Amino acid sequence: MSNLGKCTRCQKTVYSQEGFIAVKVPFHRSCFKCEVCNWQLVLTNYKSINGKVYCANHYPVGGLSVTPEKTHTTSDDLVMKNALNAPRVETVNEQLRGGNEKPQTSTDDLVTKNALNAPKSNLVNNQVRGTSDSAPLTSADDLVTRNALKAPKSDLVNNQVRGTSEMGPQAGIDIVTANALKAPKLETMSGYQKSVQN
């Protein structure tokens, strides 16, 4: 059994299995208590100032002072030793990332096979938009152009309505003109209309 030294509280010898070192001095587990209230402390909940240990409630909080207070955070504490011996970030990153090794990749996995067999983006675009070598669709083959060519021409429709088609004027009198010629003639005399018989 190794001897850690004399306990600060009881002045008895502290062996490694019955005590520990905190604030650079040995304590028995049962002697590690708050200086004010004698509350049992452990290494995770104590505070120290000037070599004495306190609980969180009785830790002296002072204002400005002429004498400097020595707070305790050294590398001798168990918590600090564990923190100093913890693996470094660089070591963890090298272990996880594999350092400077090349990645192990193959084309045997399913995702890579599907990606290799997928249609290429320019092929899909050519199917949808047409190839860049072909001219734009302005020929008479599209539906809009065909319908526009089949539509009746506006001057042809107007000529048929007005009777001025290329066949020449109509010879003969139509019914409207014949009825107008047969209608009784009216004379106007001082605002009155009189019927005149032929």
UniProtKB/Swiss-Prot annotation:
InterPro entries: Znf_LIM (IPR001781)
Domain LIM zinc-binding: 5-65
Keyword Repeat: yes
Mutant phenotype after disruption: Cells exhibit normal growth, but display altered morphology and F-actin distribution. They show changes in chemotactic motility associated with increased pseudopod formation, are significantly impaired in growth under stress conditions and highly sensitive to osmotic shock.
One function term, GO molecular function aspect: actin filament binding
Entry's localization field: Cell projection, Pseudopodium; Cytoplasm, Cell cortex; Cytoplasm, Cytoskeleton
SUPFAM superfamilies registered for this protein in UniProt: Glucocorticoid receptor-like (DNA-binding domain)
Domain of life of the native organism: Eukaryota
Biological process according to GO: actin filament bundle assembly; actin filament organization; chemotaxis to cAMP; cortical actin cytoskeleton organization; establishment of cell polarity; response to osmotic stress
Alphabetized CDD domains for the sequence: LIM_Mical_like
GTP-binding recorded as keyword: no
Keywords: Actin-binding, Cell projection, Chemotaxis, Cytoplasm, Cytoskeleton, LIM domain, Metal-binding, Repeat, Zinc
GO annotations of cellular component type: actin cytoskeleton; cell cortex; filamentous actin; macropinosome; phagocytic cup; plasma membrane; pseudopodium
UniProt-listed PROSITE patterns: LIM_DOMAIN_1, LIM_DOMAIN_2
Functional note: Binds to F-actin and may modulate the chemotactic response during early development and contribute to the maintenance of the strength of the actin cytoskeleton.
Xref: PANTHER family: OS06G0237300 PROTEIN (PTHR24206)
Protein name, entry field: LIM domain-containing protein D
Organism this protein belongs to: Dictyostelium discoideum (Social amoeba)
Underlying gene: limD
